[in-house]
């Protein structure tokens, strides 16, 4: 049954009143489906108001789908048709409350990748570096990914031990001013109350972020990239651990190994290898962070926040198969119009996977059944790409071009619906081109395991005007 968010002929008047129509459809109890029309209402009804930004849009969007952070939502009285009887409804309900939570596919079959981007933003980041900033913001549904299905409208925390102290307050938000890859990151703010308890010097909480479906007895690898933003009160120490817990409460996780890596710009990466040992076929799990705080002054409140820049889960490759290296094989440029004085055309490229050189071959006879390489890589072991960053760099003279680190980001794949192409227009380039000038275009991929290809695995093409 259809519900129009604009309220055209819909019971409840649309907008934040959509819940009134959906409550009659009752999809969870009656098994009926809901077709929701015009969800862009959250932007289109407010976009012309002074001071309206993508951050304010997200607050409005979050209220419609997940509910307010606190308090109630005041709604105008819904219009009624002539002769329509009054229909009394309870307080506001977010749209997500009418439908069961469905986790993403098993990351063993489809690797999970999230940079907590809703498909809009103000800037673009590559490995923590802002490579682009827009005056009016940008939109690209190809870059939309999970924003964490367990942190809205606010995270639900629990202690890691048996204590019964008051839990810290937690707030979630999207940060479009700082990110690791993409256009935004997930901001988590924690406020620990003052405590006189003897054990309050060390407090550890569990913060679930994303639900997943995992198959038992399979090996997975997960990594999270985060940045701590310290508060302004007093000194404290923090410890972070990436962890998983079953939603049912049965803790059957077997974490085989953990590692921590310091990245640039204040970012850090946590990586774990894990499996589930239960007898069931699969489990619905929550992936999140265990945050421990150590302070010498627990009798004073403590506030801090952290940014979650990226979350990835994928199959763990056996050591015997860690030999496939993804690369961009070639890049090409085709002009839109032949002999045009302006640069206008399409970049295309192709990807490949290479095997390393064989150091020792012990094939003793033509009948030897052991191959030099592993010749049966599965789909889950073959890397693929989420998107590609495109860079441009003008030649300094007829023969020379500067180092690749001087190249300027000009966009990504996907905005035109194509995974391995990019349209180039001279007026969109961030530098001036003169006749007979050459430009080098670089293609750099982001794999589905969250890794940006090093430049020696990327491709480029030179284009002359």
Predicted regions and their residues:
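Short carbohydrate-recognition loop motifs
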Residues: 169-204
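Extracellular beta-strand ligand-recognition surfaces/modules
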Residues: 224, 269-311
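Conserved aromatic anchor
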Residues: 330-333, 340-385
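Beta-strand-rich modules
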Residues: 390-394, 419-465
């Amino acid at each position: 049954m259809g519900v129009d968010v604009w309220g055209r002929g819909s019971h409840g008047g649309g907008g934040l009143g959509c819940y009134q129509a959906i409550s009659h459809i009752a999809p969870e109890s009656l098994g009926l489906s809901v077709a929701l029309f015009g969800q862009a209402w959250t932007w289109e009804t407010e976009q012309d108001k002074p001071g309206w930004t993508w951050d304010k849009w997200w607050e409005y969007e979050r209220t419609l789908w997940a509910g307010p952070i606190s308090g109630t939502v005041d709604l105008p009285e819904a219009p009624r048709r002539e002769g329509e009887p009054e229909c009394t409804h309870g307080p506001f309900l977010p749209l997500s409350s009418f439908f069961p939570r469905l986790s993403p596919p098993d990351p063993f079959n489809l690797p999970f990748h999230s940079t907590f981007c809703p498909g809009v933003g103000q800037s673009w980041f590559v490995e923590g570096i802002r490579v682009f900033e827009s005056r009016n913001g940008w939109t690209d549904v190809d870059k939309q990914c999970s924003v964490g299905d367990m942190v809205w409208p606010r995270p639900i925390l629990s202690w890691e031990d048996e204590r019964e102290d008051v839990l810290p307050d937690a707030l979630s938000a999207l940060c479009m001013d700082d990110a690791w890859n993409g256009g935004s990151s997930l901001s988590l703010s924690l406020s620990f109350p003052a405590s006189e308890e003897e054990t309050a010097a060390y407090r550890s909480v569990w913060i679930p972020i994303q639900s997943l479906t995992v198959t038992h007895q399979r090996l997975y690898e997960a990594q999270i990239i985060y940045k701590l933003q310290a508060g302004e009160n007093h000194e404290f120490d923090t410890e972070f651990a990436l962890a998983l817990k079953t939603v049912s409460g049965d803790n059957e996780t077997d974490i085989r190994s953990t590692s921590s890596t310091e990245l640039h710009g204040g970012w850090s990466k946590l990586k774990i290898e894990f499996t589930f040992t239960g007898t069931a076929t699969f489990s619905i799990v929550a992936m999140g962070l265990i945050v421990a705080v150590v302070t010498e002054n627990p009798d004073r409140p403590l506030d801090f926040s952290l940014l979650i820049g990226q979350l990835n889960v994928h199959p763990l490759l056996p050591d015997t198969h860690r030999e496939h290296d993804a690369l961009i094989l070639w890049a090409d440029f085709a002009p839109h119009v032949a002999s045009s004085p302006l640069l206008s055309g399409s970049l295309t490229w192709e990807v490949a996977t290479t095997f390393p050189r064989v150091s020792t071959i012990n094939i003793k006879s033509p009948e030897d059944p052991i191959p030099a390489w592993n010749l049966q890589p599965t789909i889950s072991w073959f890397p693929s790409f989420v998107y590609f960053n495109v860079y441009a760099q003008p030649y300094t003279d007829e023969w020379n071009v500067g180092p690749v680190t001087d190249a300027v980001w000009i966009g990504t794949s996907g905005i035109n619906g194509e995974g391995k192409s990019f349209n180039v227009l001279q007026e969109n380039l961030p530098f001036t081109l003169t006749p007979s000038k050459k430009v080098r275009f670089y293609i750099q991929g982001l794999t589905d395991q969250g890794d940006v290809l090093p430049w020696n695995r990327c491709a480029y093409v030179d284009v002359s005007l």
